[in-house]
Structure formats: structure tokens, C-alpha cells
Design a protein with these regions (language model features):
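Membrane-embedded alpha-helical bundles of multi-pass transporters
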Residues: 111-126, 154, 173, 412, ...
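Flexible metal-binding regulatory segments at protein termini and peripheral loops
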Residues: 1-126, 249-250, 334-342, 747-848
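Conserved cytosolic catalytic loops of P-type ATPases
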Residues: 26-45, 50, 55, 200-203, ...
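Juxtamembrane coupling segments of multi-pass membrane pumps/enzymes
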Residues: 76, 182, 191-194, 207-268, ...
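Hydrophobic alpha-helical transmembrane segments
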Residues: 136-145, 152, 169, 205-234, ...
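Conserved ATP-binding TGD loop and adjacent catalytic N/P-domain core of P-type ATPases
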Residues: 16, 432, 512-514, 538, ...
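ATP-driven catalytic headpiece of P-type ATPases
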Residues: 90, 309, 430-476, 506-587, ...
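Transmembrane helix-loop-helix hairpins at the membrane interface
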Residues: 87-241, 352, 717-722
Length: 848
């Protein structure tokens, strides 16, 4: 895959011709030409080469060159800040300066009775020659229309410039022929005939057409420049210099000279130059430029930092981990540009029309002129109709309808931390009917947290937390880490634990201040005779809520329960509610047990739950759900990669620095489910904008061309002046681009407004559950009782180990009952099952 810069394209017909020319090169697999960015992406292999591709473009009448890969960001900024609008403005001003006196002399005295200079008052030939000179000057100033139009016509691919140049040249040549008639009459002394011919001059039309088209081109160029504002603002954020430490001294060098492994420092108020890892220091970093997150993120040793983010209040020393084109900022820019360079499926309609549009318009103009001549109208009248058809038609509006909306939409998404990898992803995301969400890390925070501290009689919360943190301080279990982390956050001091012992399948034991402390599951406390009915009931209630209750006892007496769970993110419920308001069904897909999954579903409002699914089986569930509508799968992009790939749209959430996730079509920089709804809303608004643009482009041409040809003359005697046709054409592209710019007003946190779509119809039982139910009726089952399981992580580990056995159809693990129920499609020996449990680190009691 290689990118090329293309020069000489002015409209959709040009890009279509370039695309056809490159497709004709042997070895070219795929080619996409972007009129908006004047670029081309080509996927090719031998015998095709970059030189052959450039030669094919050159033979088609355009220019092409491989994009320079060195100093890429600087080149991109230069290309985005094109001085094309300034060049067009100079031409426009010069044309207008000449057009005003031309219009005064040609039409002012006829329409408004304005006085003429004495030299013109009685000499029609002087008026004609004056118009000839001014019009010729305007045509020279705007010679690019004639050069481009003629070149395209000679290559058999007429474009918009061909239409403009033909219309203007026809008026100019006809007027010059009339001027010769005037000269002949004047030489023969027939001033009256010469004065009569004066009304047949169309020089002002030729000049006005070129000037008005230039007005439209200027407005279009300015508007197109604004479509890349989001990318340019990101580039502006990148610092130009970095302060690195080399040979023990601080040195300020250009940011692009920082290499991987360099140590750099960032002072308060400075932007971080490259991606890195904090070595020392601490600060709050504003990452809103990359993620759209307005709240600064705390950084400490070991934390990752990204280029173009702002260090607010601390001194950071960091090690460079990703530099140059590998930084998060560069990947974001690359992603947005790739999206703009690809074509949305909806653009194929405009592409097909653009390929035949200009020849069709030329044919219509010829037929219209001939028809009026045959009907008996004067040649000047017929010529005016043909010229009107040529100059009112606008292939540019068709060609720009989709890409400008894609460019603005993808840029706006990037500004808010939503990255669409392709134009197709931006179009298809809005058509989502079912959103499937992973639980851990997507709906929940992804790491266990203490949710409840419930001391027994005679103890308070702080003393219970102190005991638990002291006891768990030497444990490596994730649940222990949650307790010690909570103690640190609460500034609770801990005591030294002596003789720490892990009790597999039950908990831990240690000596604290010379007395025995134990902590773990209910079975451990019960075995010591310390579990009363109230504490048991309290623990069961916590378990029903999807939490893991941990019981603690000290010196032979129970001290309380601390519940730990992977808590639901604060915005998950609101995000699910918004998705429902948009007419989207929500499904949770998780490998966790059903009790925990249902608890999370209840908290968030999820429609359907599919639990106890192994990572490898998630793709199968997604495939079955696709029967009921378009599916978007939301996950972390790594463990869920097969499911993301299987879905119609794969959405990777919380990607952070890993923008280039291969499995995802859409990358969300933040770990916020709310951004899923924002991505769908942005896609829908972009698609609606494309529909509006295409409607305007087709409506304008379908209505404008017949009127220009004279369709209203028989019934209403309304004829369109060529100058009005040129004015309409000059505004059509501007209207399309301006409409696309409205997407800049998109707000990701704005609640959905409008009529909801009909939710996708899903069966009451999800496909996998249905299969399990049917299988249970016919398949063989075995139950293995297990010691050692303490939390949902343990059950997931056991489920994975047993699910991997040959002949095991499904596995249901119960933490409460300390057992696993296996559904088999063939006989599996008990010894094989117990061996798998033992290898997973747990103790099988019996198998039946």
C-alpha cells in the first residue's frame, strides 16, 4: 500500500479518470483517489511499480508522485495549509477589476441608462473592441480553466474545466465573429447595422462566467481548508522542542530528534514532546487534546504519557518509548487521514454518475442548441441555451458530497477521542441495531475494588480495614490488592503480619501482634466455628449482588465482612439508557458467572445477558446475533479480538495509546461507554449530512440542466441567462462544503433527540443459552466438586481449564456450591476431569 500526491484534478470526473487509469496498470489490486486531499492510495504488487503508476496518471493528463515519508508530519501540515485559496483570490480580484468596467460599458447604458464616455457614445466598433480587450485579459488571467479543460478533452476524459472553458470560449468566439461583422459594416459606412450587431455581443457573458466560477472555486477552497481544521489543530499541539538529558546535562533539541530510550524532562506548563513512561516525579496531565477527557489525569512513576498532552503542575522525568511516526498523536492523524482517503460505500453512487456526467452534459448542450435552431430560433438564442447548460452543470458538487462530510466527521470524532479507521466504518456505525458489550473493563472498571466494609459487633470500619489490610499485605491475590489499596487511600495504618500462610481454596492466616488472624471465604470461618447466622446471611446477600464477601476473624472472634467487586463505571448506566433511546438493543457478553453478570445488567439496564462464555466462543455468539440486525461489538481490542472482527463494527474501548488495534473499526481513546453512543450519533449525523449533500447535488443538476436548456420557455417564456447559470454553478459546491462544516457543531455529550428506530427483535433466550438448554436435554452431564475457589477469578480459571477438554460442550461453575457442572457431547473420563482441575491449581473432591 503506497500513497501518492496527485496534481491537476479539479472535479469528480478527474478523480474518476485517474482511478480508471491506475486500475489499468497490471498488478494494481485496489486504488482510491481523494479529490478532497488531492491524494491517491494504491495497493499493488509486481509487475506494478510506483513509476508505472505515476506514468499511467501522467498519460491520463495529470501528475502524480509518491508521498515523501521523511518529515511526514511537517509535509502534512504544509499540504493542509495550502496557499491555493490565496492564488484563486488574486485571480478573482484581477478578474473583478476588469469585469466591472466591461459590465458598465456592455450593459450599464442599456439596462440602467448610465452615461458612456464620449469615445463610445457614437462608435459601436470602439465598444466592441473595448469588450474584446477586457474579455481577453480576463481569459488570460483564468487560463488554467482552458489549459486543464483542453488537456482533459484531448485525453478523452472531459471534466468541469472542459465545460467552463467550452461555455466561455463559445461565447467569446461567437462574439468575435459578430465583431468582424460589425467591422465589415463600419468599413462600408453602415453604422446602423454595426449598432444592431452590438446587441449580439456576449463578451460580458464569457468574462462573467469565468469570474463567477472563480468566485465559487475560492469559496470552495476556503471551505475545504476548514474541513481539515481538526487535524491542523492536533498538529499545532505538538511541541517543536524537547529537553533531553544527555551526558548528564539538559539539552534542548527539536522534538523530531528525540530517539527511543532518551530521558527527557517536562516542566509545569510544558507540552510533552513524545510518548514515554514516567521515571520520577508526579503531576496532573491534561489529555483532552487526544482523548477529549476534560479532567486531568494523575501521573506517577510508571505511568504512561503521550505527546501533545499538557503537564500542568509537576516536574516529570520520563523515558521516551515511542517517537516520530509511532507516537499516539501521529497515529491519530494517520487514522483520520486514512479515513478521509478511503471511500464510503454510499460514495459509489456519485462515482458512477461522475464517470459519465461531463460527456452527458456536453451531449445535452449540443442537443439543446440544435433543437432550438431547428425550431427556428436565432443562432445566438440557441448558443445561449447550450452555454447555459455547460456552465450550470456541476460535477464538483457530486464529487465532494461524500468526502467532505467524511473528512469533517472523522476530524470531529478525533477531536473528541473517537477514531474511525475507514470511511466505511464511519458510515456503517450509525446503522448499528445491536450493541454487544464485554463486561470486564467495558461496563466495569476492570479491577476489583472494595465496595462494602461491614464490621461485626464491637468493631468499627477502620479497625476491620486495618486488620484485613495487615493480613492481606503479603498476598498476591487480586482481591487482597483491592483491600490494601483501599487502606492506602483511607490512610489506614497497617501492622506487621508474621508467619503468613496461604490456605489454598480458603484464604490466608498470619500472626498480628501475637494473635492469630484469618481471612477468606465462608467455609474457612465456618470450619473454625465462628460463622453465625447473621454474618452468613449478610455474606449471601452480598454474593447475590455479584460481590465477593471476604470474612475476617481475629483472636478467635469474627470481626466482619469486606466485600470486593469489579464495580460498574459511573457512566455505564446512562450510556446504556442513551443507546436504548436511540432504538438499539444492548447485550452483555461475558465469561463471568451468571449471578455476577445479572447483577451488572441490573445496575446498568442491559437488555440481554449471555454469561459463562469462553473467550474463544464470543465470536460465535456475535455471529448468531448478526441474524437479528447489524451488530457492534465493544471490547478491549485484545482479548475480544475475534469477536470484534466477527461483528459488523468492532469498537475498541479505552485504547489509550494503542490506536492501531487491527481488530477494531472504531477506536475509543477513553474507557467510557458513553463514547459508544457518541460514535453512533456522530456516524448517523455524518450519514444524514451525506444524504443531504447528495440530494442537493442531484437535485441541483436534475433541475438546473433542464431549465438551462430552455424547458421553461414554452410554458412560461423563462430563459436562463448563461451568467445566472455560472452564478448557480459557483455556489453549488460551496453549499455542499458549507453543509458538511455543520458537523463541527457536534457535541459528544449531547443527549439523543429525535425519533428512535424500532429496536432489533431478539429472542427471549439468547442463541447460546438456547443451545445449552437443548443440549442439556440430550447430552450427558458430570459434576465435579472443587475446593480452593474463592472468587469469580477462580471460577473463570476453572471454567477455562475444563472448557478446554475434548468432549466438553459447556461448563457451569458455582462458587457458592463449590462445584462445576460439565455438559458433554461424548464420554470424558473422571480422571481427565479431576486432572484438569488439579493442574489449574485447585483440589478436586469427587466427580459424579
Amino acid at each position: 500500500m503506497e500513497k501518492f500526491d496527485v496534481t491537476g484534478m479539479t472535479c469528480a470526473a478527474c478523480s474518476a479518470h485517474v482511478e480508471r487509469a491506475v486500475r489499468g496498470v497490471e498488478g494494481v489490486k485496489e486504488v482510491t483517489v481523494s479529490l478532497l486531499t488531492n491524494s491517491m492510495t494504491v495497493d499493488f504488487s509486481s509487475p506494478a511499480t510506483a513509476e508505472k503508476i505515476c506514468a499511467a496518471v501522467s498519460a491520463a493528463g495529470y501528475g502524480a508522485s509518491p508521498q515523501n515519508q521523511g518529515g511526514k508530519n511537517e509535509n502534512k501540515k504544509t499540504l493542509l495549509e495550502s496557499n491555493e485559496p490565496k492564488k484563486i483570490l488574486y485571480r478573482l480580484i484581477a478578474s473583478a477589476v476588469l469585469l466591472l468596467p466591461l459590465m458598465y460599458v456592455s450593459m450599464g447604458h442599456l439596462m440602467w441608462g448610465w452615461p458612456l464616455p464620449e469615445i463610445f457614445a457614437s462608435d459601436p466598433l470602439a465598444i466592441g473592441l473595448y469588450q474584446l480587450l477586457l474579455t481577453t485579459a480576463v481569459m488570460v488571467i483564468n487560463q488554467r480553466f482552458f489549459i486543464s479543460g483542453t488537456k482533459s478533452l484531448l485525453h478523452g476524459a472531459p471534466n468541469m474545466d472542459t465545460l467552463v472553458s467550452l461555455g466561455s470560449a463559445a461565447a467569446y468566439i461567437y462574439s468575435t465573429a459578430v465583431l468582424f461583422e460589425m467591422c465589415h459594416a463600419a468599413v462600408n459606412g453602415d453604422i446602423q447595422t454595426a449598432m444592431h450587431h452590438l446587441h449580439g455581443l456576449y463578451y460580458e457573458s464569457a468574462a462573467m462566467i469565468l469570474t463567477l466560477i472563480t468566485v465559487g472555486k475560492y469559496l470552495e477552497a476556503v471551505s475545504k481548508g476548514r474541513t481539515t481544521d481538526a487535524i491542523k489543530s492536533l498538529m499545532d499541539l505538538a511541541p517543536k522542542t524537547a529537553c533531553v538529558i544527555r551526558d548528564g546535562k539538559e539539552q534542548v533539541i527539536p522534538a523530531e530528534e528525540v530517539v527511543k530510550g532518551d530521558t527527557f524532562v517536562v516542566r509545569p506548563g510544558e507540552s510533552i514532546p513524545v510518548d514515554g513512561r514516567v521515571i520520577s516525579g508526579g503531576s496532573a496531565v491534561d489529555e483532552s487534546a487526544l482523548t477529549g477527557e476534560s479532567i486531568p489525569v494523575d501521573k506517577a512513576p510508571g505511568s504512561l504519557v503521550s505527546a501533545a498532552t499538557l503537564n500542568q503542575n509537576g516536574f516529570l522525568t520520563c523515558e521516551a518509548t515511542r517517537v516520530g511516526e509511532d507516537t499516539t498523536l501521529s497515529q491519530i492523524i494517520e487514522t483520520v487521514e486514512n479515513a478521509a482517503a478511503t471511500k464510503a460505500p454510499i460514495a459509489k453512487i456519485a462515482d458512477k454518475v461522475s464517470g459519465v456526467f461531463v460527456p452527458a452534459v456536453m451531449a445535452i448542450a449540443l442537443v439543446a442548441g440544435a433543437a432550438w435552431l431547428i425550431s427556428g430560433r436565432p443562432f445566438s438564442f440557441a448558443l445561449a441555451r447550450a452555454i447555459s447548460v455547460l456552465v450550470i452543470s456541476c460535477p464538483c458538487a457530486l464529487g465532494l458530497a461524500t468526502p467532505v462530510a467524511i473528512m469533517v466527521g472523522s476530524g470531529v470524532g478525533a477531536k473528541h477521542g473517537v477514531l474511525f479507521k475507514t470511511a466505511s466504518a464511519l458510515e456503517q456505525t450509525g446503522k448499528t441495531q445491536i450493541v454487544v458489550l464485554d463486561k470486564t473493563g467495558t461496563l466495569t472498571k476492570g479491577k476489583p475494588q472494595v465496595t462494602d466494609i461491614l464490621p461485626a459487633s464491637g468493631y468499627d470500619a477502620d479497625s476491620l480495614l486495618r486488620l484485613a489490610a495487615s493480613l492481606e499485605s503479603k498476598s498476591e491475590h487480586p482481591l487482597a490488592a483491592a483491600i490494601t489499596r483501599r487502606a492506602g487511600e483511607s490512610n489506614v495504618e497497617t501492622d506487621e503480619a508474621q508467619g503468613f500462610t496461604a490456605l489454598p481454596g480458603h484464604g490466608v492466616r498470619a500472626e498480628i501482634n501475637g494473635k492469630t488472624a484469618i481471612g477468606g471465604n465462608a467455609a474457612l470461618i465456618k470450619s473454625k466455628g465462628m460463622l453465625d447466622a447473621d454474618m452468613k446471611a449478610l455474606g449471601e446477600r452480598l454474593a447475590d449482588e455479584g460481590k465477593t464477601p471476604l470474612y475476617f476473624a481475629f483472636d478467635g472472634r469474627i470481626t466482619g465482612i469486606i466485600a470486593v467487586a469489579d464495580v460498574v463505571k459511573e457512566d455505564s448506566g446512562q450510556a446504556i439508557s442513551e443507546l436504548k433511546d436511540m432504538g438499539i438493543r444492548t447485550v452483555m457478553l461475558t465469561g463471568d458467572n451468571r449471578r455476577t453478570a445479572l447483577s451488572v445488567a441490573k445496575q446498568t439496564g442491559i437488555d440481554e445477558v449471555v454469561s459463562d462464555v469462553l473467550p474463544g466462543d464470543k465470536a460465535e455468539v456475535v455471529e448468531k446475533l448478526r441474524k437479528y440486525g447489524k451488530v457492534a461489538m465493544v471490547g478491549d481490542g485484545i482479548n475480544d479480538a475475534p469477536a470484534l472482527t466477527q461483528a459488523d463494527i468492532g469498537i475498541a474501548i479505552g485504547a489509550g495509546a494503542d490506536v492501531a488495534l487491527d481488530a477494531a473499526d472504531v477506536v475509543l481513546m477513553k474507557s467510557s461507554v458513553g463514547d459508544v453512543a457518541a460514535a453512533i450519533r456522530l456516524s448517523r449525523q455524518t450519514l444524514r449530512n451525506i444524504h443531504e449533500n447528495l440530494f442537493w447535488a442531484f437535485f441541483y443538476n436534475c433541475i438546473g440542466i433542464p431549465i438551462a436548456a430552455g424547458a421553461l420557455i414554452p410554458a412560461f417564456n423563462i430563459a436562463l441567462n448563461p451568467m445566472l447559470g455560472a452564478a448557480a454553478m459557483s455556489l453549488s459546491s460551496f453549499c455542499v462544503v458549507t453543509n458538511a462544516l455543520r458537523l463541527n457543531f457536534f457535541k459528544p455529550d449531547r443527549p439523543f433527540k429525535g425519533k428512535s428506530k424500532q429496536p432489533a427483535e431478539l429472542p427471549k433466550l439468547m442463541p447460546t443459552e438456547e443451545n445449552i438448554k437443548n443440549t442439556e436435554e440430550t447430552a450427558m452431564k458430570k459434576t465435579v466438586y472443587i475446593n480452593g475457589m474463592m472468587c469469580s477469578h477462580c471460577t473463570a480459571h476453572v471454567q477455562k481449564a475444563l472448557g478446554a477438554l475434548d468432549g466438553v460442550e459447556s461448563v457451569e461453575v458455582s462458587l457458592e456450591d463449590k462445584k462445576a457442572v460439565l455438559t458433554l457431547n461424548k464420554n470424558v473420563d473422571d480422571a481427565v476431569i479431576t486432572a484438569a482441575v488439579r493442574e489449574a491449581g485447585y483440589e478436586p473432591i469427587k466427580c459424579e
